Amino acid sequence: MEPLERGWITDGNIEKFDEVAEAVRRAVKKCGTRTKNVAMALPPSAVITKKIVLPGGLSEQELEVQVESEANQYIPFSLDEVSLDFCVIGPSASSAGDVDVLIAASRKDKVQDRQGLAEAAGLNAVILDVESYASRLAADRLIQTLPNNGADAIVALFEIGAFTTSMQVIRNQEVLYDRDQAFGGAQLTQLIVRQYGFTPEEAETKKRGGDLPDDYGSGVLQPFVESTAQEISRAMQFFFTSTPYNRVDYAFLAGGSAALAGLTAAVTQQTSFPCSLIDPFAGMEIGGGVRENKLRREAPSYLTACGLAMRRFLQ
């Protein structure tokens, strides 16, 4: 894992290409991999997705023509300016003999930025996914370990990033609701800066290393944990008021700030729903050269990356 400074990537746009490319090179060097093919992801804000219904039995070429025709209705750009892809989900539940097809499109400049990052690090981008789709892929494997293989369970997945927390509510691999909220781990860093007078860089380093004054737990961390739990509870209330559902069976926390001491307990207390950290490596064999304690400690941060890596086994 290699941290990026604030402002290097904003709303999915790579603002400091050279700096981000150098960070990618450092990450590749650290992990020691000889693999050159990589899977990458765009944030949902950079991708337009739409589920459409098309006649069943079409060839791949016929599907492509139909998708391009339908896409013009939903994409506010010329098709020459976007990278477009689609996949057949399965038979349509609403129209006998037809199939549901998911189309996804992103501006070519955003796609080329990701490809350029890979090339700058000596890598070859073979898959470009959407972050939320990759997260769900990794989470779905874990949902299947729940009682009754997770069938009909309503699972709320929260990914707590630096500036944004993403919520997805999933049932039987279907997304019932999704929402982004503007809060994240960077707010904790800002609290540390204000409380102790550190620079933002010092605060981030000390936060990650646990090298903070004795009153940090009670004076800074605990209020932030309680505030985060309240935000998560508020997000659930939005779900309940926006859909016919009134319960969540399980809440999973992922992301860089998910493992903060006391957060899962605070969420359970705020919401009355069971909450736990997600470990995308659960049930996997860990290689001998991997520092397992460190991996387990940071595991919630790797949910999206794990989902991207799993694409290798789903081709």
Sequence positions of predicted segments:
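Hydrophobic/aromatic-enriched cytosolic interaction surfaces used to assemble or bind macromolecules
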Residues: 1-315
